[in-house]
């Protein structure tokens, strides 16, 4: 009797979760380094347009809802966990779609990196500060960067898919 190896049609989940784990590790290690090196609000200019600075974000992207009474910590944590469940489902179903899955893996790693901050500290640790003259882009972290790159790749993948079906 011949043995057949069944390969799931959905593709493997492990490689994508591995990418998410790498994002989480780099994100958390960078935040630990900043916490050990900087006092809150301290900044170190690396170039004429880029500083490292330690700030806490109790809200969402760009400080949205950061001045709310505290409920946002749990709301954004729940949102991150919900996004994790949806992304894991999508990765199981579409793991063979490389660009789509890579984008989701980056978003997942970034979302979980920020969820970990909210659970451990009650806020997200941000430290990358780009500026021009007196204008500063809101500080962010590696998790935010992974989410942004993942979102851009997701949009690119969808545009490519739509154009391919015309």
Swiss-Prot record:
**Which spans of this chain does the record mark as coiled coil?**
none
Q: Which GO terms describe its molecular function?
A: aspartic-type endopeptidase activity
Organism encoding this protein: Burkholderia vietnamiensis (strain G4 / LMG 22486) (Burkholderia cepacia (strain R1808))
Q: Which InterPro entries match?
A: Peptidase_A8
Sorted UniProt keywords: Aspartyl protease, Cell inner membrane, Cell membrane, Hydrolase, Membrane, Protease, Transmembrane, Transmembrane helix
Q: Tell me the protein family, please.
A: Belongs to the peptidase A8 family.
Q: What is this protein called?
A: Lipoprotein signal peptidase
What GO CC terms are in its UniProt record?
A: plasma membrane
Its annotated pathway reads: Protein modification; lipoprotein biosynthesis (signal peptide cleavage)
Where does it live in the cell?
Answer: Cell inner membrane
Q: What class of enzyme is it?
A: hydrolase
UniProt lists the gene as lspA
What are the catalytic residues?
126, 144
Keyword hit for Membrane: yes
Catalytic activity, as annotated = Release of signal peptides from bacterial membrane prolipoproteins. Hydrolyzes -Xaa-Yaa-Zaa-|-(S,diacylglyceryl)Cys-, in which Xaa is hydrophobic (preferably Leu), and Yaa (Ala or Ser) and Zaa (Gly or Ala) have small, neutral side chains
One Pfam short name: Peptidase_A8
């Amino acid at each position: 009797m011949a043995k057949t190896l069944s390969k799931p049609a959905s593709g493997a989940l492990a490689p994508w979760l591995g990418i998410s784990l790498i994002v989480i590790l780099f994100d958390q290690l960078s935040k630990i380094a900043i916490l050990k090196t900087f006092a809150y609000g301290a900044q170190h200019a690396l170039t004429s347009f880029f500083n490292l600075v330690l700030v806490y974000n109790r809200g969402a992207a760009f400080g949205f809802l950061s001045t709310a009474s505290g409920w946002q910590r749990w709301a954004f944590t729940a949102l991150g966990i919900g996004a994790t469940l949806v992304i894991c489902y999508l990765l199981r179903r579409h793991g063979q779609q490389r660009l789509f899955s890579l984008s989701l893996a980056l978003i997942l790693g970034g979302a979980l990196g920020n969820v970990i901050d909210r659970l451990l500290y009650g806020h997200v640790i941000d430290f990358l500060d780009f500026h021009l003259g007196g204008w500063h882009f809101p500080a962010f972290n590696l998790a935010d960067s992974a989410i942004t790159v993942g979102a851009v790749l997701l949009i690119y993948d969808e545009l490519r898919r739509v154009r391919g079906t015309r």
